Amino acid sequence: MDLCLKGSQINLATRQKTKPKYTSRSLTTLHNPCPHFRPRSANFLQQRSRSSPFLGRPQSADPKFGRRLSNYFVEKELRNGGKRQVSSNDLLKSLLEEPIKRSWLCRSTCNSSESDYSLHKRTPDSSEEGEQFLVNMPVGEKVKSYSSYSGNQGLSNGALLQRTAKPDLPGRVSFSKPNMHADLDSSDCDNDKQEVRPSISAPGPLTLPSFLSKVEQADPVGQKKSVHFGSTAAEGEVLAETYEYPKCPSENCTCSTRSSSTTSTNEASASDVKCACDAPSCRFMESSKQVEPTSPTPTLPKAPSSELDVIREYKQAVEGVQVVKNHLGTDTLNNIEILPNYLDKYASPTKEKQNNLSETKNMATNSSAVNNGSVVYRPVGNPRNFGAENNFLPAVQDDRRSFANGSSDGVINNYLKVASTPPFVGKKKENVKPASADPIARSSKSKVTKSTINPAPLGKMKKAISVGSLREERKLSEYNLDKVDSWMSMQDQKQYDGKHKPGLEDLDEAQDNDTASQLSLKSNEDSRDSTYDEIVSVIKEIEEDKKRDNFSEGIPSELNLNLDSRCETADTVTVSEGKVPESGDKYKDILAYLNNVESSCDKTLMETRRSIPDSNRSEVEFVVEPDVTDEVPKLSELLMLPNHQLARRVIALSLRANELANAIHMSKEHVFQLRGEKQKSLRAEKSTAAAKLRDQKKHYEEVVTRHQGFIEQLLKDKGSLCEKVAALTRRLESQNQAWEHRLETELARTKETTMAGEKIRRERWVRENTKKIKELTVKGLEAEINKMNCDHQREVTELKRTHQMQLLDALEEARTKHEQIETSIRESCAQDREAIIEKERTAIRERFERQLEEEQRTQAEQRQKLTEEFAAERDRLQSELRQRENEHQARRQEALREQEQELEQAKFEMQERMAKQEEKYQNRVNTIEQQYQADFELWKTEHENKTKLAQAEKENAIRQHYRAERDRQLDELVVRMEADALQHKEEHELKMNRLKEKYEKDLVLAESVEKSLREKYAETRGKLAEADAQVRNSQAEVKQLQLELSHSKKMCGDIIMERDRLRDNLNADIQSELGVLNERHKQEMDQLQKRVHQTIQRQEETIEILKGDNDALRQQCLKLNAVIRQQRKDYCVK
């Protein structure tokens, strides 16, 4: 099952990657888990900046400052508590709420494939060769990971053609096939690079022009193959001579670069393409030496562990297959040139013993162009060409095939095998239409099939081996069990078999017909005037009947169709379309694969129906076939003949009787020989099928154990990752707690220091102001106080401005720093989360596949058991159900009667009881309501009187207290002012006297200095005017900058709020999309499971139908054989 098929790309290299450890965290995110809100200090200062700038006292002088600050932080915490979002920490916790508990310990498995397979025997045919892929792998700049590769890989033309096989990987199951590297695309060189061939050339192997390598052709003499047919009575032989293409001498050779995927790909660049047999005659061995890649393939460095080797192989294989599909296109398999064959008239008297018989099968559809040649047979003693004069034998492959399929061929051939004539030597020649004659044939395919026939002793007639015996006598190694990856491969094997196996059957049947025809010619040379004309007329009639019957029939295909060939046909359809699916659309790939499997089932049924010949003649017609009695002479005619004519006729009839007796004897021997060969072939087929089943079972068990090793390793990795994640979350929580504790202590310390500083400044301000008030007089008290208030307000605003700028700078620095840390933490958590989700998904997929296989196995076992139990249980339950129904009906009637009586009595009692309770409840409610109204009126009047008296008393006491305090302070102040005024008056008088004397002395000096000062004053006045103008300009600029600053602050606040809102929306959208994706994935997996069950059921039904058709055909063949035997007996008797 191709689940992903590319779906199991697990990057184990991420386990080796070190994860960053963060020792610092944002103070804002520690106090508030939501990362999208501004720090509280910024909001607090923004709120404070909105207050009035003309306060009379500092804000710390307010005794409610501390309480308001604490209340602000509490309200901010409560207000942000409802808007908290899930952090990366909480997201990891939610992902790993229920980790998978594993009882085993985390142990290091350096080589899981070898340790898991150590309990099983490994055959030489099971995955011993290394997988060879030519991949240019670029190395990353930051992380040297082998999990991703570039799509622009440099591949040579030879490497592109050698890498069409899919690898064996943990996520996909596939069959391998023999490599088709010989089918090169030569369509580009048809016009200018094609060789000039002669019109008629000597027969022999015709090879395609190779554009990749220069292959020397072998000696034609060594490739000439002939088959000798002898007779039992004479020493003569029939020589059928042909030529064959060279075949790899090794039985296990598939000439394929395909091998198992268990070994590392480090050997791929060195070994390149090489045949497994190392034979000098193998065409792949010669061609592989000439192919040179356009770019050198770098060798991969050694990975730290075998798991990385396995994943690296997988990635290389997947990328390589995609690159090959992109380079090959859609018309690679359709542009193969047809092998041209020419008719050569030659004669060779040599008699060589050869073992191989080959035939080139042309699949061109133009039948008129094919029927141009004829098969010529030349006897030794007579130069006449009997076959050419009388149209004795069919000359075309289609006619020969139709002739071999006739129902009466065996009867005629058995009567013609007479060995009493001199030896006859003939040659079998081929006549096939050249490839250049028909333009349509240039886009079709031509295959070459090879069959081996063991040599027979001299002097005895040897029968050509049929395709059934060839298939039964094939060794198990020829099935390429070491190349089998799994049971659902999609290759071209079915198409290959459908084109070549009918060719083998046609070849064998044509060989039998040719042998029979040659023997008939040898036996009838002396008696051509009597028997020869009758035989020729019978053969002509049979040919005409067969042409009418089999005109609409196609080429018959094999009836023994298996599951892997149908799957390969489906893959051929997908490859010819040339569509390379992306690695992301795995679900669509799986559905397309299932559709191809179902279409292959339907196509197989249709081909089987078409391949079954629908004979127009029934068995009854064969039995009741009328005898030819028109030529039997009458008795009166015989009596009128002379004696010498009667004697001559008696001699002819005696010779005819001898011929028929010899034919009957040879037919019996042939029947015995066929029976023995059939029994031997059946036994060999059973033994080979059992051996193949054992080997396949062994191979599949090894594949399952290897996949189980992968799954166990992934589970161990998941367990270690879960432990690391848990440790990381614990460490983050401890760091969170430490930072929160530190933040609380720092806040408390700063609060205490600010409160102490404000208290000291307030006391200093109070002392300075009291001192100034004492120095002032009563008259200038109000003006001085207003001045002091203005100065204090100006100082307060300057301090606020400086403090605000300092705080904003510090907060901006902290914000940038914390945002950087936050983004780095978020990125690392997102990467870890993606890696964990990917590994979880792969582990779930693997576990689902294993559970699906187990359920399929247990379903078949439980089905039979459950059906039996269900039948028994159904009978027992039906009997019990009838008894219970009868009892239940009786009980039900009694219960209904009792229930009706009890219900009427209960209704009556309940009505009485409800009436009494309602009256009692109404009385009680009325009394309670009246009592409540009276109590409430009394309490209301008392409470109003009490509150009024208490309020009046409090107001009087407060009014009297503040009046007395005001009078006392005013008296003290007046007394203090009067004493200060007297003292200041005395001091002023003394000071005035001293200064008067001093000023009189200085007046003279001042007048002299006055002139110079006036000049300086004029200059200073000009400078002052300039300074005033500059001050006004500066003030205007300051106002403009303040307006711009307020506008910028407002815009910044709006932008921050918009950013927070967008983050919230994006997070909500991501969560909703994740939920939708999870639901869609679950639905797809359910649909996929149902579809897989339907496909498997469809395949089982197809196999059953094909088995039924095969059995019906076998029965029909037996019946036809019985009819033919009966006809032989009747004919011999007559």
Swiss-Prot record:
Coiled-coil features, chain-numbered ranges: 732-1131
Annotated region (Disordered), positions in chain: 111-131, 168-208, 286-306, 425-455, 492-528
Keywords: Cell projection, Cilium biogenesis/degradation, Coiled coil, Cytoplasm, Cytoskeleton, Differentiation
Tissues with expression: Expressed in chordotonal (Ch) neuronal precursors. Expressed in ciliated cells, like sensory neurons and spermatids.
Phenotype caused by lack of the gene: Displays reduced climbing ability and die very soon after eclosion. Loss of protein expression leads to truncated sensory cilia formation and impaired intraflagellar transport processes. Simultaneous knockout of Cby and dila results in lack of motor coordination and absence of cilia in chordotonal neurons where centrioles fail to build a transition zone and Cep290 and Mks1 are mis-localized.
Polar residues biased stretches: 513-522
Compartment list: Cytoplasm, Cytoskeleton, Microtubule organizing center, Centrosome; Cytoplasm, Cytoskeleton, Cilium basal body; Cytoplasm, Cytoskeleton, Microtubule organizing center, Centrosome, Centriole
InterPro entries: CEP131 (IPR030465)
Keyword rRNA processing: no
Domain of life: Eukaryota
Broad class of the protein's primary localization: cytoplasm
Amino acid composition bias (Basic and acidic residues), ranges on this chain: 180-196, 494-504
Gene Ontology biological process terms from the UniProt entry: adult locomotory behavior; axoneme assembly; ciliary basal body-plasma membrane docking; ciliary transition zone assembly; cilium assembly; intraciliary transport; intraciliary transport involved in cilium assembly; non-motile cilium assembly
Listed GO CC annotations: centriolar satellite; centriole; ciliary basal body; ciliary cap; ciliary transition zone; cytoplasm; pericentriolar material
Known function: Cilium-specific protein with a role in cilium/flagellum formation. May be involved in transport of components into the growing cilium. In germ cells and sensory neurons, plays a role with Cby in the building of the transition zone necessary for the formation of the ciliary cap and for the correct elongation of the axoneme.
Family classification: Belongs to the CEP131 family.
Name assigned to this protein: Centrosomal protein of 131 kDa
UniProt source species: Drosophila melanogaster (Fruit fly)
Gene name, Swiss-Prot/TrEMBL: dila
